[in-house]
Amino acid sequence: MSRLRRTAPVLTLGLVAMLAACTAEAGPPVLTWHINPDDGGQERIAQTCTEEAGGEYVIQTALLPREASDQREQLARRLAAQDSSIDIMSLDPPFIPEMAEPGFLSPVPEELQDTDGVVQGAIDSAMWGEELVTVPFWANTQLLWYRESVAEEAGLDMNEPVTWDALIEAAEEHDLHLGVHGALAESLTVWVNALVASAGGEILVNPEAPSDELQLDLDSEQGRQAAEVVSRIGSQGLGGPGMPTADENAAMNLFQGERGSFMVNWPFVYTAMAAADSEVMDDLAWTTYPRMDAEIPAAPPVGGINLGVGAFSPYQDQAWEAVECIVRPEHQAEYFLTDGNPPSAMEAYEDAELQEEFPMADLIRDSLEEAEPRPQTPFYNEISIGLQNTWHPVSGVDPQVTPGSSQQFITEVLRGERLL
């Protein structure tokens, strides 16, 4: 009999007997899918795929911590201990290389390696090196949300690409606030990475190198351009009085205030503001992520969740069959409708109900095609925290100093010469 595979702290004798029966030879294997917190959509998909499996397997879910960094820590620790109870994992893209490099992930079967019809940003974030090591589930990107009345008053043609300079000038001239993310958190790394990438640069040059050989390129013209945007917004208070602690939710609240104007944020804000019956909804519009240069397309952020299978699971074949079911386009479309998380499959965006519920759906899909991942390296955690520590508070960012000092600090951390 397989060893007990459950996360509940207390089990009754009856439940133990039931689980033992499930894992016995006569019953289907019970797959544990470790999920990030949502509004119940992953649990519903698990139930649907269990029913569709026809007795081949049963999927149960186990809830991971709310913060992505805590999810990473828990999964990495358990996989390092060769925990066989981890069958399927919902993985935040930046932490995938850290799981793949030491062999914690089961190889993706050939039949699931076909990425035709998947948005490019999700494909890029599912890779480690040249290999697809996870399967895209849902994908996320940031749009530029704005008040139509403000854009009109500022004389901005929002049918044309808009730049950060134009947004900053509009906020300065009309005494308005910009919804950005200045908190000492992952959201700050997301913002800086998008600015550097949109300027044509990259934070990390050689992501597959060992930690002591990694080369950063923050100390560059593109890094200084990114710092200039952050500095202008931070030093002039354009991000509002709460900018040092402003995460995505704070930016949304600021946007709904009297001096709200423009905001970069994930699509969750649309359903959140609609659910709150916000007065802003009548004046709300959206477009692609701001450009650094009017002639160069932006590189929007990409996030979401990819699915991996634990290398120590005794049920890897069944787990991959379950993954194939979970990521079906119709399930992704339903998940967008119930939980507000956009699909990675282009086909899902053709769903009529989805199109009606999310009028910006096509823009999200197109943005995901242009999106650039954060540095794909097993040492992402060190890079992200190091960047946050050196670019916060944003009011203190100096375009001539911060990129270089940040690069030096992170490099010393990676080489073991300095502690975070």
Q: What is the predicted function of each stretch?
A:
Residues 2-4, 11, 15-95, 278, ...:
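Conserved N-terminal structural module of periplasmic/extracytoplasmic solute-binding proteins
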Residues 93-141, 198, 285-286, 356-357:
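Hinge/lid segment of periplasmic solute-binding proteins
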Residues 133-137, 142, 165-219, 231, ...:
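Extracytoplasmic/periplasmic solute-binding protein
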Residues 152, 366-420:
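Conserved C-terminal helix/tail region of periplasmic/extracytoplasmic solute-binding proteins
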Residues 152, 232-238, 274-339:
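Extracytoplasmic/periplasmic substrate-recognition and gating elements
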Residues 171-172, 211-244, 289:
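Glycine-centered hinge/linker elements that transmit conformational signals in sensory
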Residues 287-288, 336-386:
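Long, aromatic- and glycine/proline-rich binding clefts that accommodate carbohydrate-like moieties
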